[in-house]
């Protein structure tokens, strides 16, 4: 979509790391703050796609991104950025968790993309990262998990979102609902989109693309309703193709979102 982006992470001193950097640069993403670990290998995830196009993940450990260090360059990158997106997976190791918490202190707008990948999380860490967020993005299962760990008994989606917003002081919560679209809550108001009917080929990357589009259009001062509609369109388009990063044209996005 054209927004300038930068990644803070760590790769191994290996061929996989070199290949990853080349691939990231193809998308014109700043790799300055991707560190090279002297001993741990580049992260690897084994993905299995079922007959419905739904993915399951086996995330190897330990890997280079378990030991992301704080650097002056990374610190400054976060400080100057309009938004800082972080996930829960990177906090499975204390080294990277400590770095993340330091970076969050200087972020202007903090976006938490919750990804529960057992056994790579702890409840205390999830609570800590949620309370740091200005915007929380999760799916329905993850929302129910959050309501459970905070002791909320009801199953109504909207009531859970209101409760969590008040409990964690998170002003905006966005819940993706797969083929049924998404719902967003901000300061007492709800925005919903029912999604787009498409032939799903591969869901890997759809959630990330959805969030990226939501952030982009919000940064372009689109209304929340319009931003959510376009984000759902982006997630749907990505699901039509194999792989997490298919090339999606602006025209195809706008055409689907009409």
Regions found by a protein language model. Give the residues of each.
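Beta-strand scaffold of nucleotide-dependent catalytic cores
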Residues: 46, 57-60, 193-194, 214
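Alpha-helix N-cap/helix-start capping motif
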Residues: 14, 40, 140-141, 208
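Conserved phosphate-binding/catalytic region of the ribokinase-like
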Residues: 154-258
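Ribokinase/PfkB-type carbohydrate-kinase core domain
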Residues: 23-36, 51-191, 222, 253
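Hydrophobic pocket-lining residues within nucleotide cofactor-binding pockets
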Residues: 11, 89, 198
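Substrate-binding N-lobe of the ribokinase-like
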Residues: 1-45, 49-54, 62-64, 256-258
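A general structural signal for well-ordered alpha-helical segments in protein cores
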Residues: 17, 43, 100, 143, ...
